[in-house]
């Protein structure tokens, strides 16, 4: 079991190495045990991660009980919710790469035999999974848990309620006192943001991927069921180390398709598309936007989840969690049940053993009673997005929108224009130079999209960007436009007053301009001299690829 760690614990030449370990309280028989690393995302930066320390402490004790020498190391986190709408949001997607680097460096640099990664906020999940795949030693992902819903009177709240309250204030639909009440009650506990936003989308999909245990990803952060997941995850990891089951044995093209099927079924975040493109690359597998679109067309939405729907992730957990979702998909032949999981059993065997609760619940619907017949993450292409774009259509009553472009080069100017009433029904807001290189860091545009919803324009105005969207975004939005503006993509050539059509039925994003005029604009285009970054952002800018390939940093 200690195939890797024996390099530092065995033989007389490793006496100095063992001396260092003795200072950490290890001795004698410990040196024959496997070294299991616990990557801890604990942080008091954000409620998403503030409850993780107790998870890490319990996991460390459980692993030791099962015969491991356990070593805890830290992984950083950026709070998307707190950095939203600020220059700090540029570091959010960058942190996915930093987290993966940290995990790979510690696991490989310290000759670990296994890995348990514990995370909470959005980029902890894809960053952790990419790190597990790069290290490719037996590993498992353990989620820190979801936050419980907040309440203001009878109204159920999430953090997105606060963002939308800002827009409501802009149209004088809410008083300052009411906004502050929403602010005070939106986040009542620790845990990741409580709708089917990015963190909960990714954690739910990790169950289908086979890298997290069934029913472990939807449990509220403060709860007994989370403690049970810790125990079973530790036991499963030791078994994987014993049997030599590695992440790349589990994460394959077929299991990634299972994960994306769950993303579609729960009405998940657009970020899942970006992250699974990167996860597939780390797994040495293949996934394209075309694959994502094919999955979308097959898989119905069977959960009416926030942000556009009614239910929180805690509601989904009470209704049977991801196993219940996967059971419904499996009945319709939409899950490949032969895929291996980190337990050593197939996903079909795991589903058979899983306890599925409340079959009468309306939180998870049978596929023949689906909320939508197809997934709501639509891949678009056209003369504005030669390499693709991703639209989220949950909660929309319109699938075709044509309107006049309002072009902005900064999120701040865009939000101010929306709140000042300068964006009207039918407009197409175009936010440019916010892609992987242009941001740099491809920041999320929750503030402008929430402002549109709060101003009553969620169904009647459209927002298009080469940046990203929060999992809390809903409305008529198109992101991940590739090529991005900063590399001369067509989105950089859009001008105020241009006419744009978003056709979700025909997967089209079209700028109404003749080819000659578009070519003339392209010939005249020059990159604006506005980018002035250094350090980590400069390194990211110089090495990052385009969003249609997962925005992977070299």
UniProtKB/Swiss-Prot annotation:
Its cofactor is [2Fe-2S] cluster; Mg(2+). [2Fe-2S] cluster binds at residues 48, 121, 193. It comes from Tremblaya princeps. Keywords: 2Fe-2S, Amino-acid biosynthesis, Branched-chain amino acid biosynthesis, Iron, Iron-sulfur, Lyase, Magnesium, Metal-binding. It is an enzyme of class 4 (lyase). Functions in the biosynthesis of branched-chain amino acids. Catalyzes the dehydration of (2R,3R)-2,3-dihydroxy-3-methylpentanoate (2,3-dihydroxy-3-methylvalerate) into 2-oxo-3-methylpentanoate (2-oxo-3-methylvalerate) and of (2R)-2,3-dihydroxy-3-methylbutanoate (2,3-dihydroxyisovalerate) into 2-oxo-3-methylbutanoate (2-oxoisovalerate), the penultimate precursor to L-isoleucine and L-valine, respectively. Mg(2+) binds at residues 80, 122-123, 444. This is Dihydroxy-acid dehydratase. Belongs to the IlvD/Edd family. Its EC number is 4.2.1.9.
């Amino acid at each position: 079991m200690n195939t890797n760690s024996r390099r530092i614990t065995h033989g007389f030449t490793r006496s100095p190495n063992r001396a260092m370990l003795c200072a950490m309280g290890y001795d004698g028989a410990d040196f024959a045990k496997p070294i299991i690393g616990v990557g801890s995302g604990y942080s008091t930066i954000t409620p998403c991660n503030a409850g993780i320390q107790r998870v890490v402490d319990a996991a460390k004790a459980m692993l030791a009980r099962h015969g491991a020498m356990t070593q805890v190391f830290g992984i950083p986190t950026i709070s998307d919710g707190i950095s939203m709408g600020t220059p700090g949001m540029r570091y959010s997607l960058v942190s996915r790469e930093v987290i993966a680097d940290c995990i790979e460096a510690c696991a490989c640099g310290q000759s670990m035999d296994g890995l348990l990664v514990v995370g909470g906020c959005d980029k902890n999940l894809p960053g952790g999974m990419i790190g597990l795949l790069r290290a490719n030693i037996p590993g498992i992902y353990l989620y820190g848990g979801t936050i419980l819903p907040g309440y203001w009177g009878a109204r159920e709240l999430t953090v997105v309620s606060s963002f939308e309250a800002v827009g409501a204030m802009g149209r004088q639909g809410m008083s300052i006192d009411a906004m502050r009440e929403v602010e005070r009650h939106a986040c009542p506990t620790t845990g990741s943001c409580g709708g089917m936003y990015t963190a909960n989308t990714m954690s739910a999909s990790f169950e289908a991927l086979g890298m997290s245990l069934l029913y472990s990803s939807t449990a509220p952060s403060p709860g007994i069921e989370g403690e049970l997941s810790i125990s079973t995850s530790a036991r499963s990891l030791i078994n994987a180390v014993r049997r030599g089951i590695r992440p790349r044995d589990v994460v394959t093209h077929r299991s990634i398709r299972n994960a994306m099927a769950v993303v579609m079924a729960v009405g998940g975040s657009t970020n899942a598309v970006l992250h699974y493109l990167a996860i597939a690359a780390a797994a040495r597998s293949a996934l394209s936007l075309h694959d994502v679109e094919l999955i979308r067309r097959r898989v119905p939405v069977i959960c009416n989840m926030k942000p556009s729907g009614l239910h929180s992730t805690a509601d989904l957990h009470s209704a049977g969690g991801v196993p219940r979702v996967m059971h419904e998909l499996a009945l319709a032949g939409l899950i490949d049940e032969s895929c291996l999981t980190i337990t050593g059993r197939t996903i079909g065997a795991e589903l058979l053993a899983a306890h599925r609760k409340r079959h009468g619940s309306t939180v998870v619907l049978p596929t023949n009673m689906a909320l939508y017949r197809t997934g709501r993450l639509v891949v678009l292409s056209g003369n504005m997005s030669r390499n693709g774009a991703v639209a989220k259509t949950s909660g929309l009553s319109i699938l075709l929108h044509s309107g006049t472009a309002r072009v902005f080069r900064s999120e701040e100017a865009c939000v101010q224009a929306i709140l000042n009433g300068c964006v009207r029904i039918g407009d197409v807001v175009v936010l440019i130079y916010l892609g992987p290189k242009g941001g740099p860091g491809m920041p999320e545009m929750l503030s402008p999209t929430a402002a549109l919803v709060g101003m009553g324009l969620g169904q009647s105005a459209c927002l298009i960007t080469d940046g990203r969207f929060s999992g809390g975004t809903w409305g008529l939005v198109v992101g991940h436009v590739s090529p991005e503006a900063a590399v001369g993509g067509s989105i950089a050539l859009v001008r105020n007053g241009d006419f744009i059509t978003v056709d979700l039925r025909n997967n089209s994003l079209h700028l109404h301009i003749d080819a000659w005029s578009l070519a003339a604009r392209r010939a005249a285009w020059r990159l604006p001299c506005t980018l002035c970054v250094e350090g980590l952002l400069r390194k990211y800018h110089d090495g990052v690829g385009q969003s249609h390939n997962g925005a992977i940093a070299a």
